[in-house]
C-alpha cells in the first residue's frame, strides 16, 4: 500500500525534530532545472504568478536564490516534519516513533511542485511552488508538463519496492493531476471525507484536508496493508459509508454535532 498526499504552503523549520534520520530526494537534478527558471523571476513576477503579497514574493525570491544542494540537517529538514498545513495537522508526524517513520518511509509519498516526489525523511529546503502554477519551463507551459512522466515513473518504482499495486490517493486534485493514472501500475483507491452541514453531506475543504492526514496516520500507526482495513477508520467521528462507496472510492461521513 502506497499513500500519496499533497505538500503544504505553511512550513516549519524551527521546532524540535522527532527523528535525526534523513535521506536525499531522488529528483534533485530536476528540481535544479526549475530553480534555474525561478531565479530569473523578479519578486513582481513571483507575486503575479503565485497571487501572493509583495512581502511573500520577496521571501520566495530569496528562497529560490538561496536554494543549494547538497542538503544537510544544517540547511534542510525532513519533508514530513517541514510541512505544516491542514493535512499535516491530522498526520501529527512530530509524535511518530522510529518504527512509524520506517513504515512511512516505505509507504508514504508527498507530491511537490519543486521536488516532484518526496519520501517522508527526504531533506528539503524551504520553497513555495504549487503544482498548479503556470511556470513555463524547458518541458512546457506548466509544472504538469514538467513532472507528469517523471512522477508516474517514480510512483511505479515506489509501488514495486513496497510490494503491491495498491495506491491510496489522499492528495488534492491539483496535485494528483500531475500523475498520469493510466500509466500507473496500480489499483487507485480514493478516500473521500464528507461532513454534514444543515442536513446535507459535502466536502468541507479544511475538514477534508485534516481527515486525509488522519487517514495517513491511521494507516501508518496500525501498519495497514489491505483496503478492507481502511474501512474501519473512525478517527474524529468519521465512519465508513458502504452505501455511497464504490470499489475505487471509499466514502467516510461525519455527522453534525447536535
UniProtKB/Swiss-Prot annotation:
- Transmembrane residues, as ranges? none
* One GO process term, biological-process aspect: response to hydroperoxide
> What would be one Gene Ontology cellular-component term for the protein?
cytosol
Cite the Pfam families for this sequence.
Answer: H2O2_YaaD
UniProt lists the family membership as follows:
Belongs to the UPF0246 family.
Which NCBIfam families does its entry note?
PRK02101.1-1 (NF002541), PRK02101.1-3 (NF002542)
- Name-wise, this protein is UPF0246 protein ETA_07010
Q: Which organism is it from?
A: Erwinia tasmaniensis (strain DSM 17950 / CFBP 7177 / CIP 109463 / NCPPB 4357 / Et1/99)
Amino acid at each position: 500500500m502506497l499513500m500519496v498526499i499533497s505538500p503544504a504552503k505553511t512550513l516549519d523549520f524551527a521546532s524540535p525534530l522527532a527523528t535525526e534520520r534523513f535521506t536525499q530526494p531522488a529528483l534533485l537534478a530536476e528540481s535544479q532545472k526549475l530553480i534555474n527558471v525561478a531565479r530569473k523571476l523578479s519578486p513582481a513576477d513571483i507575486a503575479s504568478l503565485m497571487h501572493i503579497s509583495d512581502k511573500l514574493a520577496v521571501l520566495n525570491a530569496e528562497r529560490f536564490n538561496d536554494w543549494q544542494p547538497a542538503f544537510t540537517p544544517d540547511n534542510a529538514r525532513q519533508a514530513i516534519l517541514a510541512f505544516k498545513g491542514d493535512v499535516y495537522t491530522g498526520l501529527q508526524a512530530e509524535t511518530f516513533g522510529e518504527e512509524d517513520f520506517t513504515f512511512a518511509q516505505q509507504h508514504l509519498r508527498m507530491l511537490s511542485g519543486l521536488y516532484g516526489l518526496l519520501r517522508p525523511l527526504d531533506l528539503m529546503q524551504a520553497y513555495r511552488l504549487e503544482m498548479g502554477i503556470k511556470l513555463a519551463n524547458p518541458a512546457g507551459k506548466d509544472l504538469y508538463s514538467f513532472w507528469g512522466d517523471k512522477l508516474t515513473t517514480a510512483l511505479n518504482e515506489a509501488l514495486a519496492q513496497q510490494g503491491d499495486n495498491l495506491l491510496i490517493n489522499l492528495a488534492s486534485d491539483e496535485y494528483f493531476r500531475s500523475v498520469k493514472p493510466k500509466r500507473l501500475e496500480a489499483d487507485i483507491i480514493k478516500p473521500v471525507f464528507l461532513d454534514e452541514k444543515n442536513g446535507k453531506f459535502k466536502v468541507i475543504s479544511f475538514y477534508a484536508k485534516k481527515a486525509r492526514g488522519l487517514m495517513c496516520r491511521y494507516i501508518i500507526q496500525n501498519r495497514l496493508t489491505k483496503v478492507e482495513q481502511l474501512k474501519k477508520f473512525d478517527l474524529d467521528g468519521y465512519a465508513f459509508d458502504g452505501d455511497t462507496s464504490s470499489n475505487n472510492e471509499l466514502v467516510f461521513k461525519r455527522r453534525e454535532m447536535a
